[in-house]
Amino acid sequence: MGTTVALTLVCVLVCGIAFAGAVFVLMPGARDRGTTASAGGSPTPDGRGPQPRPNQSPAPSVPSSTEEPLPGVDTPATPPPSTPVANTGTYECPGFSGIQLPVSMVLDDTFAWGDDPPYKVGTGSGDINWRSDPYRKPSWYMWLHSLRWLGNGIHAGQRGDRKTLTHVLAIIHDWVQDNPYSWKGDVGAWEATMHRTNVLLCARQAVLTGLRVSSLPAQYAWLDKSLVDHAQFMIVNWSGPSNHGTDESIALFGVGCTLKRPELKKLAVDRLTQAITTAIDPQGSTNEQSVGYGMFNYLLWGRATTALQRCGSSPGPVIAQRRAALSEWLALATKSTGELQQVGDAVRQKPTGAAGTALDYVASLGKRGTKPSKRVAVFDAGYIFGRTGWGETRPFAQESTYSIRYGAARRLHGHDDHMSITYSSHGRDVLIDPGHSGYQLDKWQAWSKSPAAHNVMTIPSADTAAVETRLLRASITPTWESYSLADSPAPGVTRKRDVLVLKDPDLVITLDRGQATSNQRYETLWHLAPEQKVTVQSPTAAVAMKPGDKSKTYLLQIPYQQQPPADGITVVQGQQDPVQGWYYPDIFHRQSAPVVKFNRTGTNAAILSAVVPTATTEAVTYKTRTVSGMFFVDLTVGARKATIRVLPDGRLSRIS
């Protein structure tokens, strides 16, 4: 593979989602992995791939794979304490996360990762073949070099099991001998550096505790030398102000604290101080364009704060301020179902609460913590989060929640999801994001990041690209919100979307308008949750319902300026060529899920949609009328009524 693909694999190795029981936790990442799938489904660079690190030289490739990676966990189960911790002058072993192996496997030099069979990588004496790559999976190779799989052996050694401690140290020493500084020529060893640094620190602590000594015995001097080498590697190859760079800075601080090297501590603190203002903006938005990575950022910076305080360095006020803002951001980004919005690279997960915060409020479904001060918020970074309430007049889970994306073009862990809407109501997901297909550069990732995987108007006949989307106006009232957005996704093509979100009855109205200099295919897509069965009743109406459920969803294409054609509504599900109609609850599982398309062909299109969740016993009807150039829709949902006004410029509002 060429240098570009090799550099892309650098991120494939470290940006992941871990599976530990039923908990999914995001790993840090620092670079974009945009791809375009070839006809055969194999990955090719699309020109928006990873940016080289400062002074980065070409790195050799690691064999690619069509399998989805399964990296290890790198976040604590609960957030670090919000109150200052005692200064003990030490760096605490951060643990080994979700890829620990039984001690018996460690003693047998056998490594296992993901769902692949265990593989004997050594002789049984700690002599490891560090070039082992039996399954040709970049992440398998990187986690082998991380040494995190030695965690249970290190714990055993710390408890006094000298046989196991000796074997673990033999494996670590073998890595040090077989991978001399600088190991930058090996992508897997390179990208595992920050993880391996922490393992070395944990092993050093296990030696002191297991042998009941206060200073490192001379026979293990190589361990401290290797820690210095790892620190030097991270100094020279810092990833910058990103999640990955922040993790490196914490590990660098750990070396400085452990070896009493104040210059390393200072450099780490300086880098953290620089990174925090990029990682989290003053409004609480992260630079990763992902709600899931927002949760990771919250935990990561809590870990940084604790590490600094425990070893006598002040984290300063900015980290606490930005984390507090991010806590509010994440609370607003939590659906009424109690899960985070799956926006950007994000798996299905619940937020992790911190005592007394707004995040704790949503994590407990309103039972504790502090209720967020806002019901709806518009963030400059390109996020709109809204809800009908916080459970004041109806159960928390029965509120309706939504998200809308706009802003800067896709980067890092973002998707081409501008103008997309997610929506939850009646205790369930109605409009979904595709989720996170993983880090393998294949047709599935290309689709999951594309506009076709989101609830937007797409122009599949045009050569579209990731572009900035402008929020032109926003109106927030007690019973409705409206937004106007615009962009130009392709040369000679403009796209506008007006959105109206109602409370009582809870529903979403959108007006999509596309205009081009030549005939185009326009499709407004509505991605529904898996197991929904869609019945197309006419070119203007479809109904979706999960068998046995107590609610259903009406999807209405209301005639406006144009009469929908005979094939005005089509449904796609579980399609592989081209990919369409799927959902990823996590990177390991893919489920078919229906996509309802509202279709047009021509130089322009005007598609007025209504997405109306109801009880199964309720009916939805509407009438339209035009008065003085204004278009009105009189909607009836069960016994509730609402009148929607469409102004000539497309603005939507509720007038009753």
Locate predicted features:
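N-terminal export and membrane-targeting signals
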Residues: M1-C11
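Aromatic-lined, polymer-binding surfaces characteristic
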Residues: K137-R323
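N-terminal low-complexity, Pro/Thr-rich disordered segments
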Residues: A22-V85, R348-R368, S656
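Core hydrophobic alpha-helical transmembrane segments of single-pass membrane proteins
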Residues: C11-A20
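Carbohydrate-active enzyme catalytic cores, enriched for enzymes
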Residues: F253, D281, S285-L431, T477, ...
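Extreme N-terminal leader/anchor segments
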Residues: G72-T123
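A residue-level signal for conserved active-site and pocket-lining positions in enzyme catalytic cores
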Residues: D46, W149, L252, D512, ...
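CBM-like, beta-strand-rich accessory domains located in the C-terminal region of large
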Residues: A346, S437-S656
